Curated annotation (Swiss-Prot):
Substrate binds at Y159. GO terms for biological process: tricarboxylic acid cycle. This is Succinate--CoA ligase [ADP-forming] subunit alpha. Heterotetramer of two alpha and two beta subunits. It catalyses: succinate + ATP + CoA = succinyl-CoA + ADP + phosphate; GTP + succinate + CoA = succinyl-CoA + GDP + phosphate. One of its GO terms (cellular component) is succinate-CoA ligase complex (ADP-forming). The lineage of its organism: Bacteria, Pseudomonadati, Pseudomonadota, Gammaproteobacteria, Pasteurellales. It comes from Haemophilus influenzae (strain ATCC 51907 / DSM 11121 / KW20 / Rd).
């Protein structure tokens, strides 16, 4: 099962012939992802990496039956690229690009809400279902097929959680980087709900950070809806108020969005919060052992 993507997912790349699109498409193909082509305006009719290039997403859909796209285009063009994909009937959009203007994302978010299309990102590492499909920039070799679902606002912190779950022998069902921007395509709740419904996912790792209220909202959802064990890590416990810490969304404003508040909300919902990333594997081991007893 897994969530969002599997071995049957057909993918195209928008920004296919650019430097980033080329490199990460090569990596995806090497992993076994069903990348069936790409889109680069004015280059339709040519081939790249042995795959067809189309001028528009609609042409790609009509010719390949693709259902997912990954976007590697500059921030100023992302809104149009995302909306083009939605209008063409793509069901899953993964946008890696950082720095999309907030007003552009507001328009995108409205379109997503109107159509029900799923978007992961922007400013994210992407999605991977180990040994089946990789859409994004994550290092493939640290992943192992297994039973832990991982959802995170951070890219590199996700990789640490992945490495620990691999080393512990648990592996991952699917790993989703929802991104660190203030307006994400998908929230923690969207992904937690999918993991709760997925029979292959036995436990969940959630990695949050300061800023916004996504973790507090997730805590309410977990308390009422999630029966599987959840381990969480919140980055930024020492962050000063009013200073952006890496991601655009990682800022404590008006005294809200602190790590302490988020940890308290999650613990009140029954989530096991670890103080260090290094403790994720051990915490999972204890939770999974106790859940079987």
């Amino acid at each position: 099962m897994a969530i969002l993507i599997d071995k049957n997912t057909k993918v195209i790349c928008q920004g296919f012939t650019g430097g980033q699109g080329t490199f990460h498409s090569e990596q995806a193909l090497a992993y076994g992802t069903q990348l069936v082509g790409g889109v680069s305006p004015n280059k339709g009719g040519t081939t790249h990496l042995g795959l067809p290039v189309f001028n528009t997403v609609r042409e790609a859909v009509e010719n390949t039956g693709v259902t997912a796209t990954v976007i590697y285009v500059p921030a100023s063009f992302c809104k149009d690229a995302i909306i083009e994909a939605i209008d063409a009937g793509i069901q899953l959009i993964v946008c890696i690009t950082e720095g999309i203007p907030t007003l552009d994302m507001l328009k995108v978010k409205q379109k997503l809400n109107e159509t029900g299309v799923v978007m992961i990102g922007p400013n994210c590492p992407g999605v991977i279902t180990p040994d089946e499909c990789k859409i994004g920039i994550m290092p493939a070799h640290i992943h192992k097929k297994g039973k832990v679902g991982i959802v995170s606002r951070s890219g590199t912190l996700t990789y640490e959680a992945v490495k620990q779950t691999t080393d512990e022998g648990f592996g991952q069902s699917t790993c989703v980087g929802i991104g660190g921007d203030p307006i994400p395509g998908s929230s923690f709740i969207d992904i937690l709900e999918r993991f709760q419904q997925d029979p292959e996912t036995e436990a969940i790792v959630m990695i949050g950070e300061i800023g916004g209220s996504a973790e507090e909202e997730a805590a309410i959802f977990i308390k009422d809806n999630v029966t599987k064990p959840v381990v969480a890590y919140i980055a930024g416990i020492t962050a000063p108020k009013g200073k952006r810490m890496g991601h655009a969304g990682a800022i404590i404003s008006g005294g809200k969005g602190t790590a302490v508040e988020k940890i308290a909300a999650l613990e009140a919902a029954g989530v096991t919060c670890v103080k260090s990333l290094a403790e994720i594997g051990e915490a999972l081991r204890k939770l999974l052992k106790s859940s079987k007893n």
